[in-house]
Amino acid sequence: MATPANQTGRITQVIGAVVDVQFEGHLPAILNAIETKNGDNRLVLEVAQHLGESTVRTIAMDTTEGLVRGQEVTDTGSPIMVPVGIGTLGRIMNVIGEPVDEQGPVANEGLRPIHAEAPLYTDQSTEAEILVTGIKVVDLLAPYAKGGKIGLFGGAGVGKTVLIQELINNVAKAHGGYSVFAGVGERTREGNDLYHEFIESGVNKKGGGEGSKCALVYGQMNEPPGARARVALSGLTVAEHFRDQGQDVLFFVDNIFRFTQAGSEVSALLGRIPSAVGYQPTLATDMGALQERITTTHKGSITSVQAIYVPADDLTDPAPATSFAHLDATTVLNRAISEKGIYPAVDPLDSTSRMLSPLIVGEEHYQTARMVQQVLQKYKSLQDIIAILGMDELSEEDKLAVARARKIERFLSQPFFVAEIFTGSPGKFVDLADTIKGFRAICEGKYDHLPEAAFYMVGAIEEAVEKGKKLAAEAA
């Protein structure tokens, strides 16, 4: 709600990231941005509570060192506003929409408030539709819903970032869509690396503008909790603008746990009584307010991929448990698979999707996915026997299942466009129909005669056949 702008108040108390401000006249509304100067910097405070006696309690979006009591503060009359539009692509902004990449001001198509209502149910599209990513393992076994939310689980160094880059690249190519990356409370070094990797891999152009596909909004680990608790909303606001223009947008959040963690810090500073495991009492409300805005409308869609850190690997911890309630699919990256050199290292048995139903994806896709999982599961259950007794002790039927499973494992790998500079092999975008056809044929034994090496790092099944012929010719 807008209130009269330019009302001035004075700081009465500063405790860490929490600043109390007293206003003589009209009090600024809850969630309004109020501004002051801290040295040469513009400091934005967001109103969180009305305390009485004309005083509001605010959360600072930057460090509060240097603020003094009695300092003048001005009400902007609206929530935090961030630039939106094509000009944000290829740029890095902070939580309040200021550029932090030293490439000049952000060209924008206007400003939007970071706090907004979720779209009305009547505006939402209720059709279940798949977002084809061109990545075989994802499209076949854990397909993404257009306008859905996907949890990305994985430890350090198993390929989360490369998978994210490939998704951004493929969505831009296949759907002409843009992406927004919100870096929430992660390492500054990783944020810097990602920015440069995006430029190197062709996802973005230096300085942004034409040819860039992804906007970056960062609030990293060293920022105060106010910035980390709001930066996901700033990124989402940029994505919502693209959606309202009729785009299919990909919205990445790395890491959704840090959003909850920052909310917990802010909550404690505001003096709220903590709830389970010390989290904020408003945990489900905060998460819902963010997640419900990520949806498909009749204009366009926002599909969200959220990296989820699981504290102490405890899936019952309130933070990840609250995230799970909103997810449509999970993509689990497994170190054991990456150690075999199979990339993307997506676990085909652990990754799940609500979309994998015959009513949504069709009977053929569903049956093929289940056949693939059955073969892989059988191989997994035989691995102990193979390790102790060797392959020779297996029955003929089991030997065949193992051979097919090893081919499937290798066929689940594929060369990425964004990794061409490392691998030297050109990236492949595989259509869904080709993916289904290829895996079905392997399960039915049509390619039992080909060596398993033929299936490694190829796109469609035809390439595996060609590679098989080449390998045979070289061996002859």
UniProtKB/Swiss-Prot annotation:
PROSITE patterns: ATPASE_ALPHA_BETA. ATP binds at G154, G155, A156, G157, V158, G159, K160, T161. It is an enzyme of class 7 (translocase). It holds the Pfam family ATP-synt_ab_N. It is a peripheral membrane protein. It is found in: Cell inner membrane. Keywords: ATP synthesis, ATP-binding, Cell inner membrane, Cell membrane, CF(1), Hydrogen ion transport, Ion transport, Membrane, Nucleotide-binding, Translocase, Transport. It catalyses: ATP + H2O + 4 H(+)(in) = ADP + phosphate + 5 H(+)(out). GO terms for molecular function: ATP binding; ATP hydrolysis activity; proton-transporting ATP synthase activity, rotational mechanism. SMART domains: AAA. Its main location: membrane. F-type ATPases have 2 components, CF(1) - the catalytic core - and CF(0) - the membrane proton channel. CF(1) has five subunits: alpha(3), beta(3), gamma(1), delta(1), epsilon(1). CF(0) has four main subunits: a(1), b(1), b'(1) and c(9-12). Produces ATP from ADP in the presence of a proton gradient across the membrane. The catalytic sites are hosted primarily by the beta subunits. Belongs to the ATPase alpha/beta chains family. This is ATP synthase subunit beta. It comes from Rhodopseudomonas palustris (strain BisB5).
